[in-house]
Amino acid sequence: MPHPRGSDRANAREDARAAALAEELGAQLGRLKGAGPKIKQLLSMVQLDRPSDGERSPVGFGALPDGARTIPFGRVRRVIEQDLDARIGRLFDDIDEEPFAVASLGQVHKARTSEGEIVAVKVQHPGVAEAIETDLRSLGLVGPILKRLAPGLDARAILAEIRDRISDEIDFELEAQHQRRLQRLLRSHPHVKVPHVHTDLSSRRVLVTEYVEGLRTDEIKRLGEAERDRIGEVAFRCYLDLAWRAGTVAGDPHPDNCILCPDGRLCLLDFALLRDLDAQSSQGEREVMRALADGDAHRVHERLRHLGYLPNPRSVDPDELLEHLTTGGEWMLARGFRRIDQEYVTRIFELAYPPRSPHFPTMRRMTIPPAALLLRRVEIQLLSLLGDLNAGADWGAITAEHHSRKPASTALGHEEAAFWERHTPG
């Protein structure tokens, strides 16, 4: 058996090597000015580097994030008129020249249609799509660094999935399709609202939707504990229901994409990232969650091997694998009431991500199937959202309703279960 000090030195060398490779990866992504931040957000789902505070809840169309900028309204006008082939005065009776929301891809303006409806006009910044497409063609350059950092990772498949998802984000016509699909699915949902899309006023670079009044997350955080708990449960259940009941992974459950409507419903925004979860993957992921909840190391190992997470199964110890996954997934697995605050979120990230995670040797021997990349992103962003809300519930019991088809554990859960019984997708 190695001497403890020798083992400590070996671990320190491994940590230093991982940190150096992560820094090299960050530098490479930093050269990709258009897509770099988004690639890093998606790569954080592979658990190669601990997300920064900003990456835990990537900023959407709300606050002004680092690197985001507004553009003069004259350029916004040109994009709208070029894409919709009409003068802006014929498209809208009135439009605010100052945007009310900005992100790296574009900005959002409030407007009024000729029918008098107040709408949100999301306009892509000119040149952004071309810059991102150029970056995506260079994405293969980070593959060798990824393989050195995590030899078990199927870097080619992961990068192809990232390329596809980011390409989806810059296509507002595709986002409009996604939003119409979810708006139809959730139209009569008792607790959730999705704004309707004005298809005739939308294009590849312009997306016009219903404008929704309500409280943003910064205001929601000032509400009472009981209301924050309710909102947290609504958000958590909705994204789990979409994945496990509808087979649709909606990949952006972060604070800037949530509005509390005056009627108490939670309005969800931004559906650029959407991926169908096929029946085989869905069943396999459920089986993994059941095995984790049961603490069955060998069943977890077997299910993950079958799903493609373990390229060399013999190199991964089942007990170490179980410890790694139950540590990061504790909040979704453990039964009993838990209030999730920022301190708890920070602790989970420190345990689940290098360089501080004690499970990094196990992570390096794993990969993540492309179909599961957005699913993992949703889980991480939900944890961040619940931490922002300081929301409490028995998250383990709610999760078990989905992976083990347990009866609803709360009154709100019974209402949602009744909705899905009436609206199960065919």
Question: Which residues fall in each region the model found?
Answer:
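Short adenine-binding "F-helix/F-box" segment of the Bergerat
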Residues: 282
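Catalytic-loop of the protein kinase fold
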Residues: 248-255
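Short amphipathic alpha-helical recognition elements used for nucleic-acid or partner binding
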Residues: 285-287
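Broad phosphate/nucleotide-binding scaffolds in NTP-utilizing and phosphate-metabolizing enzymes
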Residues: 1-240, 247, 260-267, 273-279, ...
